Amino acid sequence: MIYRLLIILLYIISYIADMAGQMMPQIAETAPQTVEQTTESVSSDYSRGFTHYAIAGNVLPYEWEWYLYCQLVDRGVEWFYPYAICQIWQESRWNASSTNGKDHGLCQQKGIYWDGRAANAGIPGADIWDPYAQLYVYSWMMSGYLAAAGGNVGRALSMYYLGVDAWSDEYVGHVMAWMDYLEVR
């Protein structure tokens, strides 16, 4: 009886892992192999649409903000940039060493998913505590979620927070509320 339960449990875990892999956004064929290579895409050509922000008087780290913007431009979702600023503020207050239970780093990635997400995003072996790796994986995930949600920001935010088939009015409300506190620097 226990043997059967173990087999069923292993099957369920395998199924969930397969489904999680299918639900993640697909990566571009030309994904960089290291985070350092992603900085090569950061170009001064992007500066025309870039805005340096603060939230409620807290100035954000310029280098991280610029890097995030360039990653979103590379993925064709630069319009999402102000929302991304607010979402990361909601997640960690832009603190790269933030920890909340099983969530770590700037974008509060779950440790159990990090290795797979980083590899799928094109940066296998990336350190979960590296803010540039966090921003790279975050922008990869959000561009996929935005595509899957047909550009619906609330749906994409919920997908990031709870998973593909979930919705959270509370989380979306918190992120959207920070939009009122964005200040141009």
Residue map of PLM features:
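Glycine-rich, phosphate-binding/catalytic loops in enzymes
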Residues: 103-106, 177
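Structural recognition of the beta-strand scaffold that forms the well-ordered cores
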Residues: 86, 106-108, 156-158
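Non-catalytic cell-wall polysaccharide-engagement segments
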Residues: 2-77, 94-95, 112-185
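A general structural signal for well-ordered alpha-helical packing
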Residues: 65, 84-85
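Conserved alpha-helical segments that form or flank metal/cofactor-binding pockets of metalloenzymes
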Residues: 88-101
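Extracytoplasmic
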Residues: 79-83, 101-104
